[in-house]
UniProtKB/Swiss-Prot annotation:
Lineage: Eukaryota, Viridiplantae, Streptophyta, Embryophyta, Tracheophyta
Pfam family, one: Aminotran_3
Primary location class: mitochondrion
Protein name stated in the entry: Gamma-aminobutyrate transaminase 1, mitochondrial
Function: Transaminase that degrades gamma-amino butyric acid (GABA) and uses pyruvate as amino-group acceptor, but not 2-oxoglutarate. Not involved in the interaction with blast fungus.
UniProtKB keywords: Aminotransferase, Mitochondrion, Pyridoxal phosphate, Transferase, Transit peptide
Binding site for pyridoxal 5'-phosphate: 171-172, 311
Catalyzed chemical reaction(s): 4-aminobutanoate + pyruvate = succinate semialdehyde + L-alanine; 4-aminobutanoate + glyoxylate = succinate semialdehyde + glycine
Gene of this entry: OSL2
Tissue: Expressed in roots, stems and panicles.
Intracellular or extracellular location(s): Mitochondrion
N6-(pyridoxal phosphate)lysine found at: 340
Family to which the UniProt record says this protein belongs: Belongs to the class-III pyridoxal-phosphate-dependent aminotransferase family.
Length: 516
């Protein structure tokens, strides 16, 4: 039996219909043989349940009904179908428990930048575990790895001078902590009314209470009583989807900047604390900014004394062909969030960098109050920091951003060569991050029927051919390891093309049935 997981839509019937249709499709292809297979690729840093074909379990009883409350997964999936269980990784590939090999085109969850088998990172973790497996950073006690990592991060970030680094365990925690730091800063300056944060529609900043509130994806808010009332959302800078007829990219950027200013004036500049943005929006569909967008937005927030937070959780450490996304788009942030590639995801760690102006105020305020009363048990965990230090060395020694510049043109051009497909609305990206959006008639206003599950069909076809992609509705996202070889890029492009052709054929069948 094959069970497909439906996409999270506005109502349950849509999801059920889509799952049933996809189930019929995959069964009809004859590609899934033998034991139970399923279609369930968890969608993290985005919020739809995404089908993709999975494995023939060699386990007699499989893993149905396992004990995890699985993130971004519908309850029935855990009960009724087997998860895809990944057992090992090697370079740009992962292997399931049956030994099937997959090209990991999303680098886990945008994070295994150095691939799955970098011995230097394993060695760094092992040596630190033997030497000092844990010590905290409270009360002016800390460890050498945490001090060394903070120093290295401050020297690596060159978009502007930064003052201090605060360590977290994830990007969600980093963005959550940003809100506390900004409030602490403004309270210290006697500006207690500066509490509101402006984020963008379709943004993703995490899944904690505050970071999910900052995120502009409705599925993160539903039934969680979110977003928090101090969070506002402004326009998503997706030119293809939202530009007006005849409007150029620069005109579009100007309109969005004007809308942002109108929102600030409506709420009162004295109430707005910060604006947060990803240099390239990730889980919202891989959306690079339109020309001059960040130039205009930075001018607006600076005009009204509003802090700029750069969420570099996905874009830091070479993803775009620059060490940080801020370098590519000339962003001069007051605060920066990072995680994921910071340790190539080998050990959980995140970090915040704050400007000297902010760190000086925090320093002064903590002296008045007796301490800076924020932190986590694992802030600056020595093993995580040791691995991150080694990862940063590799990024610099191997000049990973330059490697990305060398291979990304073929990655981008190879996939974008399929933009003429009748089922593709847009293919967009920069560096080693890319998104495909399926649409009828090349129009953002003509989505395919949700129950067809076009994105899910494509994901299933990719996985059948040995490649894992991220599916979110009719959006496909890829963000492969930064160490990809030219041959692996060719493999990715080839599988993409074959999967697209099969998806086109299936869509043609669905259209024919609809018209008959």
């Amino acid at each position: 039996m094959v069970i497909a997981r439906g996409l999270l839509r506005s109502n349950a019937s849509s999801s059920s219909s889509q799952a049933i249709n996809l189930l019929k499709y995959v069964t009809s292809t004859g590609s899934l043989q033998g034991h139970t297979q399923n279609l369930c690729d968890a969608s993290t840093r985005h919020f739809s349940s995404v089908p993709s074909p999975q494995y023939n379990s060699t386990e007699e009883n499989g893993f149905k009904g396992h004990g995890m409350l699985a993130p971004f997964t519908a309850g029935w999936q855990s009960t009724d179908v087997h998860p895809l269980v990944i057992e090992r990784s090697e370079g740009s590939y992962v292997y399931d428990i049956d030994g099937k090999k997959y090209l990991d085109s999303l680098a886990g969850l945008w994070c295994t930048a150095l691939g799955g088998s970098e011995p230097r990172l394993v060695k760094a973790a092992t040596e630190q575990l033997h030497k000092l497996p844990f010590y905290h950073s409270f009360w002016n006690r800390t460890t050498k790895p945490s001090l060394d990592l903070a120093k290295e991060l401050l020297s690596m970030f060159t978009a502007r001078e930064m003052g201090k680094v605060f360590f977290t365990n994830s990007g969600s925690e980093a963005n959550d902590s940003q809100v506390k730091l900004v409030w602490y800063y403004n309270n210290a300056l006697g500006r207690p009314d500066k509490k509101k944060f402006i984020a963008r529609s379709k943004s993703y900043h995490g899944s904690t209470l505050i970071s999910a509130s900052l995120s502009g994806l409705p599925a993160l808010h539903q039934k969680f009583d979110l977003p928090a009332p101090f969070v506002l959302h402004t326009d998503c800078p997706h030119y293809w989807r939202f530009h007006l007829p005849g409007e150029t990219e620069e005109e579009f950027a100007t309109r969005l900047a004007n809308n942002l200013e109108e929102l600030i004036l409506k709420e009162g500049p004295e109430t707005i604390a910060a604006f947060i943005a990803e240099p390239v929006m990730g889980a919202g569909g891989v959306i690079p900014p339109p020309k001059t967008y960040f130039e205009k937005v930075q001018a607006i927030v600076k005009k009204y004394d509003i802090l700029f937070i750069a969420d570099e959780v996905i874009t830091a450490f070479g993803r775009l062909g620059t060490m940080f996304g801020s370098d590519m788009y000339n962003i001069k942030p007051d605060l920066v969030s990072m995680a994921k590639a910071l340790s190539s995801a080998y050990v959980p760690i995140g970090a915040i960098m704050v400007s000297p102006e902010i760190s000086d105020v925090i320093h002064s305020q903590s002296n008045k109050l007796g301490s800076f009363a924020h932190g986590f048990t694992y802030s600056g965990h020595p093993v995580a920091c040791a691995v991150a230090i080694e990862a940063l060395k590799i990024y610099q020694e191997r000049n990973i951003p330059d490697h990305v510049k060398q291979i990304s043109p073929r990655f981008q051009e190879g996939v974008k060569a399929f933009a003429g497909s009748p089922i593709v609305g847009e293919i967009r990206g920069v560096g080693l991050i890319l998104g495909t959006e399926f649409a009828d008639n090349k129009s953002p206003n003509d989505p395919f029927p949700a129950e067809w599950g076009v994105g899910a069909i494509f994901g299933a076809e990719c996985q059948k051919r040995g490649m894992l992609v991220r599916v979110a509705g009719d959006n496909i996202m890829m963000s492969p390891p930064l160490i990809m070889t030219p041959d692996e890029v060719e493999e990715l492009v080839s599988i993409y093309g074959d999967a697209l052709k099969a998806t086109e054929e299936r869509v043609a069948e669905l259209k024919s049935k609809k018209n008959n």
